[in-house]
């Protein structure tokens, strides 16, 4: 797989320690993790470049601000994370052809994000754009059955945010007749056996949207914690897929 941001056990543990205490010394972090202080400094520098604010003080490191982005080390799933791609669907297809399954591909922005019927899906920063590779034991003709558990998970979470949403059979999610999310499914296989399916999802969260669409931010009048939204959605998607398909 080319490029992208992959999971980092070091960053995962480093953030865990920084969240435990107000100040953590470089020596303490290095000893706990079995790495050098230089390695600690390098990871701190990388995290700062990714949107976290970690200050260095005479007593040690202090986590001032979270990035609130769904980086791989913030989630309990296998995730490939990209700042910008042409389409997460294309990367998902590459991974599927390599034999991957149950893997999420997330992008902050897409240059060629696509929706149903070849339509363009505008993918500006602030939204949630991802593809999921799955290999359910169903026939190719039944692949559309994957839409319902995904759309159900989205509607369920929106309801918890106080947003009443309606899902249509093609997977689009509407709020007050304005589109908030969409689902695209592409698959490979034989008539009686699905080799793999790629579920593409776009959710307008904090990103700017045209007047005919809407977003969580527009509906609620405030910015949403994108990491928390993603974390809960992925858990719900996993639950709904396991319950209805696998």
Feature map (PLM): residue ranges:
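N-terminal lobe of the biotin/lipoate ligase/transferase fold
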Residues: 2-156, 224
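Glycine-rich, flexible loop/turn motifs
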Residues: 117, 170, 212
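Generic recognition of long tandem-repeat/solenoid scaffolds
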Residues: 63, 173-175
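A short coil-to-beta-strand element that immediately follows conserved catalytic motifs
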Residues: 103-104, 164-169
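Active-site glycine-centered loops adjacent to acidic/histidine catalytic or metal-binding residues
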Residues: 113, 172, 202
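Long, positively charged amphipathic alpha-helical accessory segments at protein N-termini or as interdomain linkers
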Residues: 1-36, 45, 56, 137-166, ...
């Amino acid at each position: 797989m080319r490029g992208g941001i992959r999971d980092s056990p070091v960053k995962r543990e480093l953030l865990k320690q920084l969240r435990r205490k107000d100040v953590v010394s470089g020596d303490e972090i290095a000893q706990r993790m079995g790495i050098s202080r230089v390695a600690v400094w390098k990871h701190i520098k990388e995290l700062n470049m990714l949107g976290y604010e970690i200050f260095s003080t005479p007593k040690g490191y202090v986590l001032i601000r979270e990035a609130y982005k769904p980086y791989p080390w913030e989630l309990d799933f296998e995730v490939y994370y990209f700042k910008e791609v042409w389409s997460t669907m294309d990367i998902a297809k590459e991974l599927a052809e390599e034999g991957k399954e149950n893997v999420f591909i997330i992008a902050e922005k897409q240059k060629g994000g696509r929706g149903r019927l070849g339509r363009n899906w505008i993918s500006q920063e602030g939204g949630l754009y991802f593809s999921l590779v799955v290999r359910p034991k169903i026939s190719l003709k039944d692949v559309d059955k994957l839409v319902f558990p995904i759309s159900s998970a989205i509607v369920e979470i929106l309801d918890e945010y106080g947003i009443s949403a309606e899902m249509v059979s093609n997977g689009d999610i509407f709020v007050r007749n304005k589109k908030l999310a969409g689902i695209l499914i592409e698959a490979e296989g034989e008539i009686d056996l699905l080799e793999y399916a790629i579920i593409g999802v776009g959710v307008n969260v904090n990103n700017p949207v045209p007047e005919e669409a809407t977003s969580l931010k527009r509906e609620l009048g405030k910015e949403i914690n994108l990491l928390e939204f993603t974390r809960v959605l992925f858990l719900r998607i996993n639950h709904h897929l396991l319950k209805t398909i696998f």
